[in-house]
C-alpha cells in the first residue's frame, strides 16, 4: 500500500496579469505620442521665437491647479489600490470617487484655461498648443473612464444586490415621470 495518491491535483496556476501588461504597453504608446507632440511644439516655438505668444498670454494659476489636482489624484488612486488589496471596499470606493473628482477638476480647469487664453488656430502657436493640451485632455479623460470602469468591476461580488438596486431606481424613474412630472 502506497501513501502517494494515484493522481496528484494540478497546481494552482499563478494569476495572469494581462490587463497590467496591456496597460503598460498602452501607457508607453501614449507617452511616446505625447513626447512627440511636445517635441513638435518645442521645435516650432524655437523656430518662431519672435512671434510666439505675442497676441495671447497663458496664466499660470490654472496650470498650477491642474498639476495639483493630478498629484492629488495620484495619491487617491494609490489609496484605492491599497484599499482594494486589503479588501476595504468602502475606502476603495471613496478613493476612486476622490480620484474621479480630481480628474473632473482637471478637465474643468483645462476647458476654462482654453477659454481664458482665447488662442485661435490661425495663430502660429494655436495648432501646437491645442494639439498638446488637447491630447493630454483626452488621455486624462480616458484615464477617468478607466478608473470608473475599475470601480464598477469591484461590484462583481454583489451582482444580485446591484441588480435589485438598479431595477428599483428604474422603477422610481417611471414613478417620478408619471406622478411628479406629468401630474
Model-derived features: positions:
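...captures the hydrophobic TM-helix bundle architecture rather than a specific catalytic motif
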Residues: 1-183
Amino acid at each position: 500500500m502506497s501513501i502517494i495518491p494515484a493522481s496528484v491535483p494540478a497546481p494552482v496556476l499563478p494569476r495572469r496579469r494581462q490587463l497590467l501588461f496591456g496597460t503598460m504597453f498602452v501607457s508607453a504608446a501614449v507617452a511616446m505620442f505625447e513626447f512627440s507632440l511636445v517635441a513638435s511644439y518645442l521645435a516650432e516655438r524655437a523656430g518662431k521665437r519672435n512671434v510666439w505668444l505675442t497676441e495671447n498670454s497663458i496664466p499660470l494659476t490654472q496650470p498650477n491647479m491642474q498639476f495639483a489636482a493630478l498629484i492629488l489624484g495620484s495619491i487617491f488612486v494609490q489609496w484605492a489600490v491599497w484599499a482594494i488589496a486589503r479588501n476595504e471596499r468602502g475606502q476603495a470606493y471613496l478613493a476612486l470617487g476622490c480620484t474621479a473628482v480630481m480628474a473632473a477638476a482637471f478637465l474643468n480647469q483645462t476647458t476654462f484655461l482654453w477659454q481664458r487664453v482665447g488662442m485661435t488656430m490661425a495663430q502660429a502657436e494655436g495648432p501646437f498648443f491645442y494639439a498638446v493640451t488637447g491630447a493630454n485632455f483626452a488621455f486624462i479623460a480616458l484615464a477617468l473612464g478607466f478608473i470608473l470602469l475599475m470601480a464598477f468591476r469591484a461590484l462583481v461580488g454583489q451582482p444580485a444586490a446591484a441588480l435589485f438596486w438598479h431595477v428599483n431606481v428604474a422603477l422610481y424613474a417611471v414613478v417620478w415621470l408619471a406622478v411628479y412630472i406629468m401630474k
